[in-house]
């Protein structure tokens, strides 16, 4: 530490003072008893909340509380001792730990994973009828993601002029997939955000072609940039995904063949593919913002406030889901009881 720098003081965050912690501490046991009796539908077909959901709430109530454990730290410069409460490191309930995970994940991917090349975000949403199975069956979720990644790879191979005559088996993409289980209004909405290097990597013998532009500096790899990825390109990608995903659901016995054919004919199919966001190679700050967006937690403490006996959650977007709320909620707000808030959060806790 320099002689002129002012030392920073460690201030415990005191989660017990936050509105969310107070609501969970006061109402969680009541919700757990009612949910186990089938009074809430946030847990799907299983009335009793799953063990990982109960564990997430239990850990959250201990996170940052000194009574549940702490570490003693000592400053090597001044010799001052201070205590740091243990954190839960949870992924679904704790706003502090999920925000820290978001920041650390984005920084790591930006600094150590993504090369200095253009990165495009691909987003896939599917109809609610299919989301039901994806939300409850990890194998189905993985199946849809694999199909999505294969179609992205085929699209980039086709639109990378430098790789037009290459063997497709030797061309690969670089991608990080984020599975979102939530929508902007604390609703269940499983969909994918995939950040993909905008082009393909070619495996070559030795050091590769020194004249290739641009080129990754790793031995045996050449990068071929993609061009012409626009709305006209994405439209057939969406059609291809729609056909392949429905065919896969039929093959698994999750859809009848006649239902899949009907869904192919819908004007508004519920399938949506977007690839409009592309970050230039030099704009690392924008890339980190995109990665934070993709790794963000399901809800924000800053959007939650209390009005009388009710909780009001301000949604990031105007709600599209139907509602029977007669409490005067605005289109971009949710009016919830503490039990309803806990139930919504519980439904968004990701499985281990």
Q: Residues of each region from the PLM?
A:
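Beta->alpha loop/short-helix hinge microenvironment recognizer with preference
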Residues: 1-352
């Amino acid at each position: 530490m320099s002689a002129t720098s002012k030392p920073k003081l460690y201030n415990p965050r005191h989660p017990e003072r936050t509105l969310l912690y107070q609501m969970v501490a006061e109402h969680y046991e009541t919700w757990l008893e009612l949910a186990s009796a089938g009074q809430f539908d946030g847990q799907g077909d299983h009335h009793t909340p799953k063990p990982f959901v109960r564990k997430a709430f239990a850990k959250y109530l201990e996170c940052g509380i000194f009574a549940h454990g702490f570490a003693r730290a000592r400053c090597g410069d001044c010799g001052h001792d201070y205590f740091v409460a243990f954190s839960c490191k949870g992924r679904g309930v704790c706003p502090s730990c999920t925000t820290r995970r978001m920041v650390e994940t984005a920084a790591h991917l930006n600094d150590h994973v993504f090369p200095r090349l253009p990165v495009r975000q691909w987003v896939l949403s599917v109809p609610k009828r299919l989301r039901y199975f994806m939300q409850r069956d990890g194998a189905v979720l993985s199946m849809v993601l694999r199909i999505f990644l294969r179609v992205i790879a085929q699209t980039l191979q086709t639109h990378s002029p430098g790789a037009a005559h290459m063997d497709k088996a030797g061309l690969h993409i670089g991608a990080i997939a984020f599975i979102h289980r939530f929508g902007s209004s604390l609703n269940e909405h499983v969909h994918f955000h995939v950040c993909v290097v905008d082009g393909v990597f070619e495996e070559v013998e030795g050091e590769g072609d020194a004249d290739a532009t641009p080129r990754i500096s790793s031995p045996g790899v050449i990068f071929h940039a993609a061009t012409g990825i626009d709305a006209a390109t994405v439209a057939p990608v969406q059609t291809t995904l729609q056909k392949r995903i429905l065919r896969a659901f039929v093959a698994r016995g999750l859809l009848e063949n006649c239902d899949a054919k009907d869904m192919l004919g819908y004007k508004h199919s519920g399938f949506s593919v977007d690839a409009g966001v592309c970050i230039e190679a030099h704009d690392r700050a924008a890339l980190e913002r995109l990665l934070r967006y993709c790794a963000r937690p399901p809800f924000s403490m800053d959007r939650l406030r209390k009005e009388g006996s009710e909780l009001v959650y301000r949604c990031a977007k105007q709600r599209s889901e139907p509602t029977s709320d007669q409490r005067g909620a605005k289109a971009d707000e949710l009016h919830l009881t503490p039990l309803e808030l806990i139930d919504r959060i519980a439904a968004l806790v990701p499985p281990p």
